[in-house]
Amino acid sequence: MDITESEFTIFEVTPDPNELNNKRIKEIKGGKVNIKELFRYAGVFEIILLIIGIIGSIGVGCLNPLLMILTGDVVDTFVNGENFSKEGGSIKITTEEMNYEIMNSISDTINKLVLKMLYFAIGNMVAGFLQTICFFVLSEYQGIKIRSLYFKALLRQDPGWFDCHKTGELTSKIINDIQKIQDGMSLKFGRLFQTFSSFITGYLIGFIKCWDLTLVVLCMFPFIMVSMMGLGMSAGIFTMKSHKPFSEACSIAEQTIGNIRTVHSLTQERSFCESYNTKIMETDKYNIKKSIGIGTGLGCMMFFIMSSNALGSWYGNFVVRGKGGSDNVKAGTVLTVFMSVLLATQSLSQISTPINILNSAKVAAFNVYQTIDRIPDIDCQSIGGECPTECNGNIRFEDVQFVYPTRLSHHVLKGLDLEIKKGQTIALVGASGCGKSTTIQLIQRNYDPNGGRVTLDGKDIRELNIKWLRNQIGLVGQEPVLFAGTIRENIMLGAKEGATPSEEEMIECAKMANAHDFISKLPEGYDTIIGEKGALLSGGQKQRIAIARALIRNPSILLLDEATSALDTQSEKIVQEALEKASKGRTTIIVAHRLTTVRNADKICVFHQGEIIEQGKHQELMDLKGTYYGLVKRQSMEEEVDQETVENDLKKFREQEDKEVENISLEQTNLHNENSIVKQIKQEYKEEQKKLKHSNRFVLFRVIWNNYKHEYIFCTLGLIGGIGAGAAFPFYSLNFVDLIRVLMKLHPGINLTDEQANSILRSCMIIICIGIITMISFFCYVGLFMAAGEKMIGRIRRRFYYSIMHQNVSWFDRRENMVGAVTTKLTSDPTSLQGISAERVGDIIEIMSTVGFGFGIGLYFSWKLSLCILAVFPIISFFMFINGQLNSKNAAPAKAAYEQCGVTLVEVVEAMKTVQSLGKEDYFSQKYNNDLQIPKRGIIKWGPLLSITNAITNLLTFSINAYGYYLGICFMKKTINYQQDVPNFVDEIIDTFGDIQKALMTINSATTSFAQIGNVLPDVGKAVGAAKSIYNIIDRKPSIDCYSEEGETFNDVKGEIEFKNIHFRYPTRADNEVLKGISFKAEQGKTIALVGASGCGKSTTIQLIERFYDPTSGEVLLDGHNIKDLNIHFLRNQIGLVGQEPVLFAESVIDNIKRGVPEGVEVSNEQIYAAAKMANAHDFISAMPEGYNTMVGDRGSQLSGGQKQRIAIARALIRNPKVLLLDEATSALDSESEKIVQDALDKASKGRTTIVIAHRLSTIQNADKIYVIMRGKIVEQGKHQELIDLKGFYYTLAMQQFGTVN
């Protein structure tokens, strides 16, 4: 049956049948969501907060233009004073009395206006408090809720969906995109309403006070709107374009950091850095274009705003003289119109940042909400489907056909028919990639078949509740997946939903899996933390814990996919017996390459290219002498051994092992008395942290200086632009007061004098010039500084990744440096640096420029008033400082909590099939939600305090006008000359007021600008924390430096490896000595083998040769050179490594093989094909539709275990290494492939030193020397036959593995 892509629909995004979700999906087509959709997850409480926050924002926005009415009234008070002098001319009082009367009248009126200004200030404080606290709480709550929903949605998705998405892309959404959504709902969203309300109120006041003057000012409004629309479009388009390369960069980072050992062993650090840099630079390219677009739009907008003011200034003299459309217009009215309209249009100039942030949030929400909305066909959260009262375990495959969603043209199963009866044990055998593991996945319903059906007890499993189905199944996979935490937690994860096994039951399962003994000997026993993915355990130890986890489930169906592949022979024998016991009374399906483990199966099915070609019991198939017979014969050893002899030897072996265990226990007891090494390791760690803390003292200046150093042209122009933009408003205010002073002396029906006309024209021309300067300044300060900031963030992100790849393996072993935590830092910390990037530095420069010029001008015109107002600044600064400190205190624990969330996220996404097979979606969802409680508690603790300090700052800033006018009138009353003629007295009042108004308006622009620092401080607090986190890693100098150019190199490398009295402890487990004085030699061109029980230290020797770690004492030599003295890349380039768990990267087959090529070496396609042929990989690669260009999926998910292993072998062989390290290199291969690959490896070993770690002794019987390791010591050594003749440990292992094979 041919399956076309159009027919394959089960993995497409499936809309929710619910009408609401259908509506949502329609609404979000187009790359970003609308405002309503952005807040779709807001509950009643959050909606109330949103409404109150919007009201507060509108209040803050309205009060500033309304304050201009009072300011205009102040001006008109002086104009009225002049009128009063004319009216009082007929009254017979002395000139001095008249002057006092005029002054007192003005003073009384202004004092009343000052009181009203104070009421406005209090209103602004209340509105500001509501705005801050509501949006702070709203954004934090929504961020936590969306993180939780997204994580839950990921847990819900089917494996087919994950096959089509890279882990890095998914994790970047929760780390980066949700932060953008949160920013879009924060106070920055409130600023949108603040600016729009300010805009509307300002123009409304203008039309009410003087409609014709406002219309003249509005002439430029269409141009302002076009500039603003261009700004918004630039932000939206380039934000969307930057998303794809950034996600791809995150994917590269997550893959490489998660597989750092493989990256180091292949010396591919620089290559991956180049790939990462390419994606980040592509992201930077779009972000820089966005910045230039925003800067250009904002510069043009400011020019048109100033031009409109120039037009208004020119027309102002007509309306005051009664020649306009409005009647009774005074200078104060002109001032009110101008200032309110100026504030309205100026508010638009501040809208770029919130619009940019909102656009980013809407684009990010589109990506995140799509995942949350998606309801898969295979929905593990569904409550639908049958839940039978019992499960008998009768399984049937009926004409099942299947293709994977990412390889639609490759048929994995072709009409599979198979019946498995209750309680039967069925074995599936065959070559790698023939479909065995696929059948296991179909039984769990990880995928649905494209044709036919799978039934359980006669019911199609698609009709069963999926949680109920998976609850009946226990699975032990080919590559054991454990989770960061304790051994106890990992075993307990196997328990059925709602069940709580006792301690005794858990220990019994561990004993059945032959895990109890090694667990008991660990310092913390079952409470031992095993590290990320169980990194602190050997492969065999992980496998045994996974088996214990499956057994504690007591399932009706047991699925064993190469369950004992990673075990040593002794453990395999014991565990196999346990599994056979566990299989009784339940249906068991075994996938195995070691055919000794399936002899007792009720039925053995031989697969070939997706079809069963033979089936029957072991002896029936042996008698058939077909494919199965050939597979068995290939695995048989030549020796035939009497079973009774084997049992006696096993007994003897166990007795000897018990004695060895007793000795080890004594050694471990002695370890507690030998604390010098442990103390040394811990002391080194403390000193490292102390150095890093010292280097963090000047981190803020380092970030700023590093940015300026690399972008000095952009930054210099931005610096000049920032100063120009900051100076524009004080000088505009100065010029505007001169204009108002002229208008105050105009009267209806009176023509302009030449001096007045020239003065008005000069003011208009100055405003035009300020507009041109402002346009250029804003382009430089916003556009170029923002572009420099984006380049800085990109550069630091690249350097940060480079430094992470720089770290030695032991650094990644630390709990705080797990993959999720490190990728979270890499994604979020550089983004947080925007708080101290060039853009923010530009904001601060503009603010300080405004403050400097404002107070400079103020001091020149009224030094007393300026100094009195300046005295308020320390109080404002104090509250700003407190606000910044509170922001830092809030940000630090939240940052740590989100990093821990990142750890859980990456861990779960990478192991999603295991999580879903265990049915532990709710467990991990709860664990993730528990991590989110820390930032949630911070909201309640810090939100009110932040809002109060911010509100007090607003109160003080808003009160400056009232304070200034009150002081100004007091100074005038004391300094003015009352003894002159009334007209001269009035002129002096107006001139003196003009100077005070100049000082006050310029100072007011300074204080308003200074208050904007409060908006910058929260971002600065986050940025400083992020910078410390980044530079902690950048400044760290690892003891094993993979980038180091130092160290010896030499020609004619022979490849002789020698261990001299090696002792070793892992830095994270300093209390446990792994190797205890090991010495051995692998001579040039020879093959040595290391055998022994899981966890005895075999794989550790491989890691020491690769120099992932340095020994605690002793020496590892290459051709007589201590490897510590060799250049690290030179050393690793001499080595080819194939590990126990093959690691491939999410790229094509050919690119994965090329990863083995040392840096600077070119290889042809023919050489790649030759390496693949040697690894027995060429045929299956060529059979795939895309051949060598086939994408292998995230971590090789589109290939079988055996296929991945063969590509990994080809990758090692293409290095043409002098030393070949094979750590269970053929463990995942079927017997046919193993034989071919083993022959290839035997050939490849000629002329090079080969060190083999193997549990299958058949693969190492031809080794030149075999070393038997037990508990970190070599207990036997010799050739295969010598050790067999010795009849010691090795002999017993061999007998235990092969017994009486005919």
Swiss-Prot record:
GO terms for molecular function: ABC-type transporter activity; ATP binding; ATP hydrolysis activity; ATPase-coupled transmembrane transporter activity. GO terms for biological process: transmembrane transport. It is found in: Membrane. The chain crosses the membrane at residues 43-63, 118-138, 192-212, 213-233, 292-312, 331-351, 712-732, 765-785, 841-861, 862-882. Its EC number is 7.6.2.2. SMART domains: AAA. It comes from Entamoeba histolytica (strain ATCC 30459 / HM-1:IMSS / ABRM). Energy-dependent efflux pump responsible for decreased drug accumulation in multidrug resistance parasites. Disulfide bonds: none annotated. Residues 395-634, 1057-1296 form the ABC transporter domain. ATP binds at residues 430-437, 1092-1099. PROSITE patterns: ABC_TM1F, ABC_TRANSPORTER_1, ABC_TRANSPORTER_2. Residues 51-360, 713-1022 form the ABC transmembrane type-1 domain. Keywords: ATP-binding, Glycoprotein, Membrane, Nucleotide-binding, Repeat, Translocase, Transmembrane, Transmembrane helix, Transport. It is a multi-pass membrane protein. Glycans are attached at N83, N663, N751, N808. GO terms for cellular component: membrane. Belongs to the ABC transporter superfamily. ABCB family. Multidrug resistance exporter (TC 3.A.1.201) subfamily. It catalyses: ATP + H2O + xenobioticSide 1 = ADP + phosphate + xenobioticSide 2. This is Multidrug resistance protein 1. InterPro entries: AAA+_ATPase (IPR003593), ABC1_TM_dom (IPR011527), ABC1_TM_sf (IPR036640), ABC_transporter-like_ATP-bd (IPR003439), ABC_transporter-like_CS (IPR017871), P-loop_NTPase (IPR027417), Type_1_exporter (IPR039421).
